[in-house]
Amino acid sequence: MATPSSATSLNVENIVFPSSVKPPGDTNTLFLGGAGVRGMEIQGNFVKFTGIGVYLEDKAIPLLAGKWKGKTAEELVNSVEFFRDIVTGPFKKFTQVTMILPLTGKQYSEKVSEMCVGVWKAHGTYTDADGATIDKFLEVFKDENFPPGASILFTTSPDGSLTISFSKDGMIPEAANIVLENEKLAQAVIESVIGKNGVSPATKQSLASRLSDLMNHFDEKATTDAEPNLSKNGL
């Protein structure tokens, strides 16, 4: 039977995403849901900027399987709702963004901030508290530089917090740089990767393929036992 513990590592442009990781400052080990490249077509060439890995708590499988078991990878990758369920699900997500090309913290944080604020204002949900959180987000990245191989690490928790860490040596640090208590930002960071307009279709494809296999081989009884949690959380 396929289980999260049977998840394999992935190599994306010589960036190795291990099969499981323990996020900074956390006691839980998360499994690799999927990984892929982020790039952009520039003057006829596909330029690769980063490799992105998305890790999930083990309980994500029974929680998602209650609704998505039996779906093919193709059905999942084309479902906005499936990825929304990952973003909002009551389980931890860990996103590792590793540089292929160099990037400054200022460039990265300003782009993410502009995207978040734009969406929130369009939806009429932007608040002064959000503005204060964005200021903290920009501050933590301000003096950072990320050469090839360096990583930005995000842990999205069900309690609505976003933990941010940096790695320059390919290792996962034990301690986090900062924890921001803002559920909208926590969800927006991972949604920017795998949401409807996510920046990495390759990561979405990888997630859909691997999670489809894990869910379709998941034990029915465990799935049934987890279903009340899904409905309770409105998924």
UniProtKB/Swiss-Prot annotation:
GO biological process, one term: flavonoid biosynthetic process
A Pfam family it matches: Chalcone
Its EC number(s): 5.5.1.6
UniProt entry keywords in alphabetical sequence: Flavonoid biosynthesis, Isomerase
Keyword Nucleotidyltransferase: no
Entry GO MF terms: chalcone isomerase activity
Catalytic activity: a chalcone = a flavanone
Residue(s) at site: Important for catalytic activity: 108
Pathway membership: Secondary metabolite biosynthesis; flavonoid biosynthesis
InterPro entries per the UniProt record, alphabetical: CFI, Chalcone_isomerase, Chalcone_isomerase_3-sand, Chalcone_isomerase_bundle_sf, Chalcone_isomerase_sf
Binding-site positions, substrate: 50, 192
Note in the entry: Part of the biosynthetic pathway for all classes of flavonoids, a large class of secondary plant metabolites, many of which are brightly colored.
Its biological purpose: Catalyzes the intramolecular cyclization of bicyclic chalcones into tricyclic (S)-flavanones. Responsible for the isomerization of 4,2',4',6'-tetrahydroxychalcone (also termed chalcone) into naringenin.
PANTHER family from the UniProt entry: CHALCONE--FLAVANONE ISOMERASE 1-RELATED, CHALCONE--FLAVONONE ISOMERASE 1-RELATED
Family listed: Belongs to the chalcone isomerase family.
Name of the protein in question: Chalcone--flavanone isomerase 2
